[in-house]
Swiss-Prot record:
Entry's transmembrane regions: 26-46, 64-84, 112-132, 139-158, 168-187, 205-225, 227-247
Name of the protein this chain belongs to: Very long chain fatty acid elongase 5
Organism taxonomic ancestry: Eukaryota, Metazoa, Chordata, Craniata, Vertebrata
One Pfam assignment: ELO
Quaternary structure and partners: Interacts with TECR.
Length: 299
């Protein structure tokens, strides 16, 4: 295993250059294997979990879901606040920011971004709760792709570009996650569900987040600094893939639902009209019969 790890490190060094020494010895960062194994186990559970739960009763998980979502809401709020203050104190340049130009502020950003990386491991629980509650319709290609890739991508980010221009996407994502996990936490309480109207806007916010990240990343390409260009190109490509998947999800979830509701409403309206027509016809027929009957009695 040590030989394999050494070979892997040599390969990464040849491909990406030397690692950032500021994160040497940090939990989970020295060796890629634990991150890879965690991701492989995650995908295995995604595959086997629904099969295991198929003939079993779903778990409620209500209490633990409230605690879990509250915890991630608070963690996301902490990361958002610390990243904003770290970037402000370090006088980060929006257009392009290197990884070694802000001193202690860079270290503050690195420490927060480690928590951001680690939060992606915690977020695997999102999927596990879906499996336990048998909400398999929520385990989409988008969901699995996003969760499985983010942990791995951020392992590489933390080892090579752990601050500087890397801050922007994480900052926006932390803000979105404050809204998202607070929504999930509240939706775990049945009495709160009628008041949760903003789910649609969370998805819209995620799409806006990806577009803004592409714009900010492109600034680093157009007005380059010491931040490696290869990472910027990768970021743009990854954001495009998320935009494509989230747009498809949005269309499937909201536009088709809206069209279905309109169709049902129109059908109901037509049925109502037919009922009125039939009622009128039946009443008229009844009146005719009544008149006929009276005539017959008179005769």
């Amino acid at each position: 295993m040590e030989h394999f790890d050494a070979s892997l490190s040599t390969y990464f060094r040849a491909l990406l250059g030397p690692r950032d020494t500021r994160v040497k010895g940090w939990f989970l960062l020295d060796n890629y294997i634990p991150t890879f194994v965690c991701s492989a186990i995650y995908l295995l559970i995604v595959w086997l979990g629904p099969k295991y739960m198929k003939n079993r009763q779903p778990f409620s998980c209500r209490g633990i879901l409230v605690v879990y979502n509250l915890g991630l809401t608070l963690l996301s709020l902490y990361m958002f606040y610390e990243l904003v203050t770290g970037v402000w104190e370090g006088k980060y340049n929006f257009f392009c920011q290197g990884t070694r130009s802000a001193g202690e502020s860079d270290m503050k950003v690195i420490r927060v971004l480690w928590w951001y990386y680690f939060s992606k491991l915690i977020e695997f629980m999102d999927t596990f709760f879906f499996i336990l509650r048998k909400n398999n319709h929520q385990i989409t290609v988008l969901h699995v792709y996003h969760h499985a890739t983010m942990l791995n991508i951020w392992w590489f980010v933390m080892n090579w570009v752990p601050c500087g221009h890397s801050y922007f996407g994480a900052t926006l994502n932390s803000f979105i996650h404050v809204l998202m996990y607070s929504y999930y936490g509240l939706s775990s309480v049945p009495s709160m569900r009628p008041y949760l109207w903003w789910k649609k806007y969370i998805t819209q916010g995620q799409l806006v987040q990806f577009v803004l990240t592409i714009i900010q990343t492109s600034c680093g390409v157009i007005w380059p600094c010491s931040f490696p260009l290869g990472w910027l190109y990768f970021q743009i490509g990854y954001m495009i893939s998320l935009i494509a998947l989230f747009t498809n999800f949005y269309i499937q979830t909201y536009n088709k639902k809206g069209a279905s509701r309109r169709k049902e409403h129109l059908k109901g309206h037509q049925n109502g009209s037919m009922t009125a027509v039939n009622g009128h016809t039946n009443n008229f027929a009844s009146l005719e019969n009544s008149v006929t009957s009276r005539k017959q009695r008179k005769d």
